[in-house]
Every structure is written in C-alpha cells, then in structure tokens.
C-alpha cells in the first residue's frame, strides 16, 4: 500500500550482505597471526550474495588472497569465469537447493566491484562445480573422518577449497545452514 514500505531480507538487499561482510573480518581475526597472509575462502554460491559480501570485505581491505565460487551444477557464474560470457539458463534441482539458481541476482554486483573487467574477476575468484554424487561423497567423507555432518551447501564449499588450496595456504569454507534442515 502507499502507507507501507516493503523490503526484502534476502541476498538482493544490500542491507543483508553488508552485515554479512563482517563475519569475513571476524573469521580473519580468529586465525593465528601467522596464518592471515595467504587465505583462500570457498563460498557455496547460488545467488552470490555471500560471495558479494566477501568481495566487499576484500575491497574494504581484508587481505584475502583468493575466493572460490563453489557451485553445484547450476554453473552460470563458473561458465562466465571460464569463458567471459554470461548466459542465464533454467535452474537444475540439486541436493544443495538454495544454490539452484540460473540467473544469480548478485552477479552484476560482483562484476561492478571489478569495473566489469572479466580478467580482474577471474584473478580474484576461482570456481569449483560439484554434482550431487560429489556432494554426497563429501558429506560422507567429512563425517567418517571428522564426525561432523556437513549440510549439502557446505559440502560444495568444502569441495571448492579442496580443489584450490595451495601448499601452505590457510583455507576456510563456509556453510549456509544446519544439516538438520536437510
């Protein structure tokens, strides 16, 4: 109505991921000082709001060496990183359903952070794509070795860090929900 102001709390609202950028700083501060110089952060990505928050923290001066856009088979952004062409498509249903996005609303924000320079985006953001079989395997593997249950989105993030962590590099992967939700 004309008397109400309506907003959204999902990742299209900058009011959500500005505060989200704070936990990137918090994570960095939790690391021992000797592990803060060479950090890789793997972010489960569907609508790319969380990755946008991390990149904003990086732009504000947080010394993150590399980000990984960890995606399920809905690989619109990984394909852009690989080819430089952004092509939306129908989403595919997966176990990591919050990442089932064929036209991520925050993609434009990411490219704008880099002045629409594909090579600059590609230099700071790597990608990893995981299918449901790989996601299930990661959940099982982490549980059997660590006794920790990953949610499907976190499993995709875990696989992204595994694919890109270099020797001597501190790696962090994010989760998005409690596994009981799934």
Which ranges hold each PLM region?
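PLP-dependent amino-acid enzyme catalytic core
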Residues: 1-182
């Amino acid at each position: 109505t004309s008397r109400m102001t309506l907003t959204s709390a999902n990742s299209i609202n900058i009011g959500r991921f500005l505060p989200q950028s704070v936990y990137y700083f918090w994570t960095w501060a939790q690391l021992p000082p000797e592990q803060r110089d060479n950090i890789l952060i793997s972010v489960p990505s569907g609508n790319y709001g969380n990755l946008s928050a991390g990149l904003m923290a990086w732009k504000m001066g947080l010394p993150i060496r590399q980000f990984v856009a960890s995606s399920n088979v809905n690989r619109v952004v990984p394909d852009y990183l690989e080819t430089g062409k952004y092509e939306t498509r129908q989403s595919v249903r997966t176990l990591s359903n919050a990442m089932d996005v064929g036209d991520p609303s925050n993609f434009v924000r990411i490219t704008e952070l880099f002045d629409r320079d594909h090579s600059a985006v590609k230099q700071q953001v790597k990608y990893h794509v995981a299918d449901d079989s790989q996601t299930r395997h990661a959940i099982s593997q982490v549980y059997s070795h660590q006794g920790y249950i990953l949610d499907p989105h976190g499993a995709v993030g875990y696989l992204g860090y595994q694919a890109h962590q270099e020797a001597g590099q501190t790696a962090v992967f994010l989760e998005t929900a409690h596994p009981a939700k799934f």
